[in-house]
């Protein structure tokens, strides 16, 4: 679940097809002898502009963002960011041995490290820098919990930053995937 994806779609049933499924956060997929933890969400650095554009569209076309199917439409969702869920991590600890993690954003040890583009957006969004810092802290919590619970993590995949990068740290291959970049997991 990326930051520009409607969280309502990720309930495990709204989009469930033979080869593609939108799963809820903290879902563990058991595929090809791997236990894959999926945790989505991230901060949109352009959230202020997205909210303003959606409000203009609603006024111009005279519609509400909640249509008859009950799925909200918008350019920004206030619940887009990731949430650390202690209870779900407790359940995962007792039921699985996680070896692959897929998230939208990444722990603070990973790229992107620079905030050069971020400061430009923060001029009109004073809470942005703190929210992004909190987001990285939340990802660090997730990583630390997985390590404390002795999960044998070998791979961590993420996107969000629209670039490609990888590194091995502490036995984990962290791989940032660019838009439309795919990779094989063995």
What are these model-predicted stretches?
Residues 13-16, 51-53, 115-118, 170-173:
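Short, glycine/charged-enriched secondary-structure capping and boundary segments
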Residues 7-10, 29-32, 44-48, 108-113, ...:
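Short catalytic/ligand-binding loop motif for oxyanion handling, primarily in non-cytosolic enzymes
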Residues 28, 38, 102, 182-183:
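Conserved hydrophobic/aromatic beta-strand scaffold that supports enzyme active sites
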Residues 34-137:
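Active-site-proximal loop/helix segment associated with metal-binding centers of metalloenzymes
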Residues 1-32, 120-123, 127-138, 148-149, ...:
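Core catalytic region of metal-dependent phosphoesterases/phosphodiesterases
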Residues 27, 77-81, 178-180:
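Adenosine-cofactor binding site in Rossmann-like domains, unifying the SAM/SAH pocket
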Residues 30-32, 140-149, 161-186:
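Binuclear metal-dependent phosphoesterase catalytic core
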Residues 1-4, 23-24, 39, 100-104, ...:
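Active-site neighborhood of phospho(di)ester-bond hydrolases with catalytic His/Asp-centered motifs
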């Amino acid at each position: 679940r990326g930051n520009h994806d409607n969280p309502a779609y990720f309930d495990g049933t709204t989009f469930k097809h033979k080869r593609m499924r939108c799963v809820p956060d903290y879902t563990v997929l058991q595929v090809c002898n791997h236990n894959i933890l999926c945790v989505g969400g991230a901060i949109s650095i352009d959230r202020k502009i997205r909210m303003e554009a959606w409000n203009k569209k609603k006024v111009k076309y005279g519609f509400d963002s909640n249509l008859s199917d009950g799925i909200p439409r918008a350019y920004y969702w206030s619940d887009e960011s990731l949430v650390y869920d202690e209870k779900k991590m407790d359940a995962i600890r007792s039921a699985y041995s996680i070896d692959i993690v897929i998230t939208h954003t990444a722990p603070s040890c990973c790229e992107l490290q620079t905030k050069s583009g971020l400061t430009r957006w923060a001029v009109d969004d004073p809470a942005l820098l703190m929210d992004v810092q909190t987001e990285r802290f939340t990802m660090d919590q997730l990583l630390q919990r997985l390590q404390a619970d002795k999960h044998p993590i070998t791979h961590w995949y993420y996107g969000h930053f629209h670039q490609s990068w990888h590194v091995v740290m502490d036995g984990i291959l962290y791989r940032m995937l660019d838009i439309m970049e795919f990779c094989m997991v063995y």
